[in-house]
Amino acid sequence: MDGYTACLRKLRKVCTSVEKQIVKADDALTHSNGLISSLLNLLEQLAACEKVSFDTEPLAHFGDLQGRLRFKLTSAIESLLVKIHEDLNTIKEVASRFAEFRRSSFDVYNQHASKGNLSVAEAITAGPVCPSIASMLEWLQQLERMYAGLCEEKTEILEGITYNDLPQSQKELRRWKTQRNPLHLTAAMDQIRVFLADQKDA
């Protein structure tokens, strides 16, 4: 098999897997966004609980009401954080897969390029419905960097949550939904789908 055909075969297999992984990550992101909204609500309740004086009438008659409310809220918060971390772990798994896809694709490319089975001209040539090999390899690199960066940002946000500074914790959490969309490479993905459909019909 010539280098060009081998690379296209590898990239077709990888891109098919990439589509599935993007859906998996997008589902986790969507689910986590709902959890973040609930978490923000609980933090607001906890902040309000900390501000209220429970030593005056009529709240003074309820014993350790503040302590019991705080315990209930923090327990709910910790439970949500566990679920959010589970979603983040799913996204991290996807990021790891993308790193594997990029490495294995470049391995195939370098293997054939080093043996002279794939020229630079072949690697940079695109067809009517087929992106160039170079473009697809670059896209895989961008995808890997995008999801690695996304994981770092989400991890940083969760690490910034503290009960000692509830306003700052809320501020950090609001960044969760405003992070750059990892699917900003939609145009490239659309082109890849055309490529995959053409390969399937070939």
Where on the chain are the PLM-derived regions?
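Short, low-to-moderate order helix/coil transition modules at the start of elongated helical scaffolds
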Residues: 1-74, 168-202
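Extended, amphipathic alpha-helical coiled-coil scaffold segments used for oligomerization/tethering
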Residues: 2-12, 37-142
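Amphipathic alpha-helical coiled-coil segments
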Residues: 18-21, 25-28, 32, 84-87, ...
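Charged, alpha-helical coiled-coil and adjacent rod-like segments in eukaryotic scaffold subunits
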Residues: 100-202
